[in-house]
């Protein structure tokens, strides 16, 4: 890039490190930069780390069936079977945004969120007011998938829509409906992305169950400045080892891609 475009980055990165030293903090961390920003951070002495998340890519699909057509027959049949099983529950599932999301919806989703977070992590870091403020200040970016049994909300998945990406955030359910998690979190997100011509759905980390549903591994990036030389050296060795393992995992996962070979 021209030197003029690099100047703001250089100034920002140097200022960040200078501030970290002045404050006497032990470390400084930059998470989820773009690949280009990540490489520039490395030139300023930060340790470069890669991670792995599972994302769905919209290849110009006009419908969910278009997406299914790119999968091998076994995975295609499995997804259709899962969606049919959810349909048999008789639930009403819809995607809500903006003014369509009421306080009653947020009350229900907060219950779902608490049920999941308390069960998995033992504590909920978001309070009820947060969700009202989210709807008030970012309502048009919120995509709330709500599943209702009659008039009663029973499950929900919270997403945020960006310029070209739908970001999956939280999920919860008050009842056990087979395959509903996959429907609400993955298939409904794909439906929404296709309808709104979004290029990506980011479903986050942890992924063998996501891969067979069309979400493939994609590298994420972070950069780390560590004040103590000894600790920095140890972390650098760990990152190198971890990167080799991530590269290996990605190759193994992609070798078992659900997509037809002519689509990989």
Model-derived segments and their meaning:
Residues 1, 5-12:
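Short, small-residue-biased leader/transition segments that mark boundaries at the very start
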Residues 227, 231-264:
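In a subset of proteins, long, contiguous C-terminal domains/tails are tracked
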């Amino acid at each position: 890039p021209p030197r003029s475009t690099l100047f703001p980055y250089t100034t920002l990165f140097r200022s960040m490190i200078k501030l970290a030293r002045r404050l006497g903090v032990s470390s400084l961390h930059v998470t989820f930069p773009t690949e280009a920003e990540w490489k520039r951070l490395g030139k300023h002495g930060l340790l470069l780390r890669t991670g792995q998340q599972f994302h769905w890519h919209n290849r110009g699909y006009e419908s969910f069936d278009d997406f299914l057509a790119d999968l091998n027959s076994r995975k295609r049949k499995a997804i259709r079977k899962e969606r049919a099983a959810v349909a048999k529950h008789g639930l009403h599932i819809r995607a809500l945004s903006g003014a369509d999301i009421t306080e009653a919806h947020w009350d229900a989703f907060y219950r779902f969120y608490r049920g999941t977070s308390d069960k998995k992590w033992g504590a909920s870091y978001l309070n009820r007011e947060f969700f009202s403020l989210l709807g008030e200040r970012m309502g048009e970016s919120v995509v709330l998938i709500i599943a209702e049994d009659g008039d009663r909300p029973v499950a929900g998945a919270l997403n945020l829509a960006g310029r070209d990406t739908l970001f999956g955030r939280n999920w919860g359910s008050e009842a056990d409906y087979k395959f509903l998690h996959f429907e609400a979190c993955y298939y409904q997100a794909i439906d929404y992305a296709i309808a709104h011509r979004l290029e990506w759905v980011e479903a986050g980390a942890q992924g063998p169950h996501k891969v067979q549903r069309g979400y493939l591994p994609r590298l994420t990036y972070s950069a780390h400045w560590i004040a103590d030389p000894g600790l920095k050296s140890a972390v650098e060795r760990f990152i190198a080892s971890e990167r080799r393992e991530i590269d290996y995992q990605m190759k193994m996962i992609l070798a078992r891609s659900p997509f037809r070979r002519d689509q990989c």
